[in-house]
Amino acid sequence: MTQLKNDTFLRALLKEPVEYTPIWMMRQAGRYLPEYRATRARAGSFMGLCTSPDYATEVTLQPLDRFPLDAAILFSDILTVPDAMGLGLYFAEGEGPKFQRPLRDEAAIRALAPADMGKLQYVFDAVASIRKALDGRVPLIGFSGSPFTLACYMVEGGGSDDFRHVKAMLYSRPELLHHILEANTQSVIAYLNAQIDAGAQAVQIFDTWGGALSHAAYREFSLAYMQRIVAGLKREADGRRVPVIVFTKGGGQWLEDIAAIGADCVGLDWTTDIGQARARVGAKVALQGNFDPNALFAEPAAIEREVERILQSYGQGSGHVFNLGHGISQFADPAHAGALVEAVHRLSRDYHGAA
């Protein structure tokens, strides 16, 4: 494989010395970019983009051609995994992802088996294609949803604002939810390992809905399964470590628990103070975050002030990957995203000694 020209992101994840704080943005390839919208129109649909390695490569590289980001992230969707489990993913215009066959009855749940990786070959082909196209420019991140977050969509049949179906199952028939989570966990381990085999140089587990759980339920139904995934992942490829990032949106109160599951880095949303997070778990893990994505609607001068505040809060030294606290808004101005990247690179050098 081609030698990495910029490995700052990987070094920061392992808390090795760096010259500046690296940055990438969740959902950095997305609707806020006019070039993405043009490619999406050519592809004909969102799944048309995801299932074509050529299109997926094109849109993955678009933000890197526009901004000097320190990592690329595979363009895909977390719901490709339950789709490969036979739930029938489709995207309703203006409504987001839906499943034709949500898991509501016991027979369907008992019949659920781990995803057939053969049905996800298009993802692994995309990883290989992107890695080749990057030619060592920056590392490539692979990703998956967490077992619980996937289960939310699988049981609800799509997005939800109250998770009443999955929560009803959790409290009244927990053994059924555990069956789904078991199938999801086996699927995610195989899925992420296949991405690593195809060329992913780091992986992130997106636990988008873990923060909707009670303290006890989070540990039993989300964290325990993510711990099993981390333990089951290949941690070395091309002679170097493949770091693992775990991100629970709304998980700031559980940082110590999350940091204990064996991941290299914990992602933070914008509601957690990164300096306090470092004091709590910084000896054990790197931290990723945690700029409020809606602060990108402010003027560049305000964006720069917020960058400085976050860098100052984290303090001196490595172990920080700058990111948004969640995905970038489709309504964000690309110029403001550019201002964010520029400010992080320029201002963060004061927080790192000679590397």
Swiss-Prot record:
Annotated Gene Ontology cellular component terms: cytosol
Residues flagged as site, Transition state stabilizer: D77
Localization of this protein: Cytoplasm
One of the GO BP terms on file: protoporphyrinogen IX biosynthetic process from glutamate
Catalytic reaction annotation: uroporphyrinogen III + 4 H(+) = coproporphyrinogen III + 4 CO2
Cross-referenced InterPro entries: UROD/MetE-like_sf (IPR038071), Uroporphyrinogen_deCO2ase_HemE (IPR006361), Uroporphyrinogen_deCOase (IPR000257)
Predominant localisation class: cytoplasm
Pfam families, per the entry: URO-D (PF01208)
Residues given in the record as substrate binding sites: R27, Q28, A29, G30, R31, F46, D77, Y153, T208, H326
Enzyme Commission (EC) number: 4.1.1.37
Keyword Cytoplasm annotated: yes
Keywords (A to Z) from UniProt: Cytoplasm, Decarboxylase, Lyase, Porphyrin biosynthesis
Pathway involvement of the protein, from the record: Porphyrin-containing compound metabolism; protoporphyrin-IX biosynthesis; coproporphyrinogen-III from 5-aminolevulinate: step 4/4
One Gene Ontology MF term: uroporphyrinogen decarboxylase activity
Listed NCBIfam families: hemE
Quaternary structure, from the entry: Homodimer.
General function of this protein: Catalyzes the decarboxylation of four acetate groups of uroporphyrinogen-III to yield coproporphyrinogen-III.
Homology family: Belongs to the uroporphyrinogen decarboxylase family.
Name of the protein in its database record: Uroporphyrinogen decarboxylase
Organism expressing this protein natively: Chromobacterium violaceum (strain ATCC 12472 / DSM 30191 / JCM 1249 / CCUG 213 / NBRC 12614 / NCIMB 9131 / NCTC 9757 / MK)
Gene name tied to this protein: hemE
